[in-house]
């Protein structure tokens, strides 16, 4: 028992000693914390005093800087107000109120256009001693300006004349086919081709040995031309761009006529020889050159004058001189025109059938076939084969009210019902698909 008591007392003393040791450690830690807090407070006081000193120094130097800032702000405010007032005065004077000199009446026409159209190269001046070289300088200047315009167009449209691939023109073939199909339908329904050709042959001046010409056959075909391999190239004069397009047409276009050859010697109608001819175009292929030009182009006028002087134009001998002069007057008015021609390596195939005689008939005489074919080729070459070309004036593309249309939805309207034989009936009307919006 005594040993147990000794052990318990020993453990008790150890516990007491441990507690005292813990209290001592706690007290020491508290003292260390207090010391650290005092040090932190002292540091904060020092920092506070330093900040106060800095603020005092700033307050001492601030009045001088405030005076400078206030003066610069005042200057900026005054200058800004003055500039705004000056801008308002200038705007009111030059933009609101018109100049008194502008009210002086001027002649209409070119004087009014010169103030609207922007002119380039106004600083170019020519002395009196340069009149001999004015023509050459103007030609060189116009050539350079045209080349610069063409280069600008090609650059802005991303088209390389030398390396761009050719186009198929499938979409264009569809549009042309629709147009030709519509024209054929109108020709079949209205017989306008027959009537126009018949009137032309009836009113034509024929020699005394040819009787009246009658139409026997007209075939407008059922196929369509195919345009392909389109490429843009420079013209020979480098003043414009040309579109080279391959054209191929395999169809049968036929015109048949019947007439009589009259022998009026030694007396009128001594003999009569019936003649029947049928000409068919079965194949055409070639390279079509298309370009847009101005009808006031100097080169165009020179070509026309040269062709007239050399006797290329035979239309004047046939009584078309008045129409050609009228066309020249129209071209002098200016405007855009479509110029097209075919290359000399075209392919044109004919089938000519002839029947001569009444009882003993001669069929398909080769001499007659070659004569007619040569005449047709000559007619085509003189009008459409390079270096000759056709010029078609383009209409104005400005939108006009008289050309405006709008689709109309089909609506059914019923009139009041009427009684017929004991049954009621109503009249149904539908308006047209398109109406003219020009009122």
UniProtKB/Swiss-Prot annotation:
Domain SMP-LTD: start-end pairs: 165-395
Presence of keyword Repeat: no
Compartment list: Endoplasmic reticulum membrane
Membrane topology: Single-pass type I membrane protein
Protein's job: Component of the ERMES/MDM complex, which serves as a molecular tether to connect the endoplasmic reticulum (ER) and mitochondria. Components of this complex are involved in the control of mitochondrial shape and protein biogenesis, and function in nonvesicular lipid trafficking between the ER and mitochondria. The MDM12-MMM1 subcomplex functions in the major beta-barrel assembly pathway that is responsible for biogenesis of all outer membrane beta-barrel proteins, and acts in a late step after the SAM complex.
GO cellular component: endoplasmic reticulum; endoplasmic reticulum membrane; ERMES complex
Pfam families for this protein: MMM1 (PF10296)
Molecular function as annotated in GO: lipid binding
The protein's name in its UniProt record: Maintenance of mitochondrial morphology protein 1
Transmembrane spans: 77-97
Ranges where the record places region Disordered: 125-145, 309-336, 405-425
Spans within the Lumenal topological domain: 1-76
Residue spans, topological domain Cytoplasmic: 98-439
Cited InterPro entries: Mmm1 (IPR027537), MMM1_dom (IPR019411), SMP_LBD (IPR031468)
Description of how the protein assembles with itself and partners: Homodimer. Component of the ER-mitochondria encounter structure (ERMES) or MDM complex, composed of MMM1, MDM10, MDM12 and MDM34. A MMM1 homodimer associates with one molecule of MDM12 on each side in a pairwise head-to-tail manner, and the SMP-LTD domains of MMM1 and MDM12 generate a continuous hydrophobic tunnel for phospholipid trafficking.
Feature: compositional bias, Low complexity: 315-326, 410-424
Entry's Gene Ontology BP terms: aminophospholipid transport; intermembrane lipid transfer; mitochondrial genome maintenance; mitochondrion-endoplasmic reticulum membrane tethering; protein insertion into mitochondrial outer membrane
Top-level taxon: Eukaryota
Domain free text: The SMP-LTD domain is a barrel-like domain that can bind various types of glycerophospholipids in its interior and mediate their transfer between two adjacent bilayers.
Keywords for this protein: Endoplasmic reticulum, Lipid transport, Lipid-binding, Membrane, Transmembrane, Transmembrane helix, Transport
PANTHER family: SMP-LTD DOMAIN-CONTAINING PROTEIN (PTHR13466:SF0), TEX2 PROTEIN-RELATED (PTHR13466)
Family: Belongs to the MMM1 family.
Principal cellular location given in the protein's record: endoplasmic reticulum
């Amino acid at each position: 028992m005594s040993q147990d008591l000794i052990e318990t007392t020993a453990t008790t003393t150890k516990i007491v000693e441990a507690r005292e040791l813990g209290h001592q450690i706690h007290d020491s830690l508290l003292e260390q914390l207090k010391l650290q807090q005092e040090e932190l407070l002292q540091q904060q006081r020092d920092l506070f005093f330093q900040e106060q000193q800095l603020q005092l120094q700033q307050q001492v130097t601030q009045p001088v800087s405030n005076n400078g800032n206030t003066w610069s702000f005042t200057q900026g405010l005054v200058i800004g107000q003055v500039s705004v007032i000056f801008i308002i005065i200038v705007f009111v004077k030059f933009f609101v109120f018109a100049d008194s000199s502008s009210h002086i009446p001027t002649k209409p026409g070119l004087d009014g256009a010169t103030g609207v159209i922007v002119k380039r190269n106004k600083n170019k001046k020519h002395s009196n001693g340069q009149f001999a070289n004015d023509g050459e300088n103007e030609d060189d200047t116009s050539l350079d300006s045209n080349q610069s315009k063409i280069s600008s167009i090609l650059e802005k449209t991303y088209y390389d004349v030398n390396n761009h691939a050719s186009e198929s023109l499938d979409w264009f073939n569809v549009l042309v086919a629709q147009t030709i199909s519509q024209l054929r339908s109108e020709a079949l329904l209205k017989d306008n081709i027959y009537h126009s050709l018949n009137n032309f042959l009836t009113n034509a001046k024929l020699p005394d040995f040819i009787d009246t010409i009658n139409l026997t056959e007209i075939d407008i075909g059922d196929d369509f031309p195919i345009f392909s391999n389109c490429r843009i190239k420079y013209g020979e004069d480098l003043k414009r761009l040309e579109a080279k397009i391959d054209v191929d047409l395999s169809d049968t276009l036929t015109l048949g006529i019947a007439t009589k050859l009259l022998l009026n010697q030694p007396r009128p109608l001594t003999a009569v020889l019936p003649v029947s001819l049928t000409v068919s175009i079965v194949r055409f292929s070639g390279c079509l050159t298309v370009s847009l030009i101005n009808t006031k182009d100097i080169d165009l006028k020179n070509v026309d004058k040269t062709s007239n002087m050399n006797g290329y134009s035979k239309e004047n001998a046939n009584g078309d001189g008045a129409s050609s002069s009228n066309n020249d007057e129209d071209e002098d008015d200016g405007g855009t025109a479509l110029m097209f021609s075919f290359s000399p390596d075209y392919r044109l195939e004919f089938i000519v059938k002839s029947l001569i005689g009444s009882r003993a008939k001669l069929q398909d005489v080769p001499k007659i076939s070659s004569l007619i074919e040569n005449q047709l080729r000559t007619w085509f070459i003189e009008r459409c084969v390079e270096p000759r070309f056709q010029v078609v004036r383009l209409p104005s593309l400005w939108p006009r009210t008289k050309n405006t249309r709008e689709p109309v939805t089909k609506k059914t309207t019923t009139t009041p019902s009427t009684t017929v034989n004991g049954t009621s009936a109503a009249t149904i009307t539908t308006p047209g698909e398109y109406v003219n919006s020009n009122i």
